[in-house]
Amino acid sequence: LLRLNAPSAIAVYDGSFEVSSGLRVLKQQLDTSTAEKDPEFVQLIISLLSLHKQLIADQAIYQKLTKLITELAEKYAEVDIYNDEDQFKLLVTECSTIYKQTLSRLPSRIQVKGEPSKLQDEHNQELVRCGLLCAMRSVFLWRQSGGSRWHFLFKKQTILNAAKQLISSPLRE
């Protein structure tokens, strides 16, 4: 999220190894030989792509989001969030606030399902919003790379093969 001027998508994530857990989930959801599927997975992807489209159409919110993320990246440029739990929690809270100030103001809302007791917990809500903000960054990279909603729906095998390749042979920055 905070790597704004990275030379490549791989550099945004510090290499594909850093997103290997996400690649495994993607593989599990797209692989027809896997029985364990989350029916909400594809819906979440479609919702994120739709939200991206609305964000691009609303220049005021888009510019506000860009400004807030740029400020956040500058603030955390020298902070080691991987080894400082307090700073990491603060970053999650700030990302959640940015999500509430921008993406949650768009007409479409992403519905998160789960146990009400866990969803009502404020820290869990912040983690979800932070995750959705980071997911939106990935949607931007997907779109910048030529990806579309239709690609996700009709080129699943190509995406699955790419995920398998990145899992078996991770790319480094």
Q: Model regions: which residues?
A:
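Long amphipathic alpha-helical segments with strong coiled-coil/leucine-zipper propensity
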Residues: 2-85
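Residue-level signal for well-ordered alpha-helical segments
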Residues: 3, 25, 32, 42, ...
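Exposed alpha-helical structural elements
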Residues: 18-21, 25, 64, 90, ...
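Charged, amphipathic alpha-helical oligomerization/scaffolding segments
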Residues: 43, 47-50, 54, 64-67, ...
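Charge-rich, low-complexity amphipathic helices
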Residues: 70, 77, 117-121, 150, ...
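Conserved binding-pocket/active-site segment within a compact domain
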Residues: 77-147
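Alpha-helical oligomerization segments
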Residues: 127-173
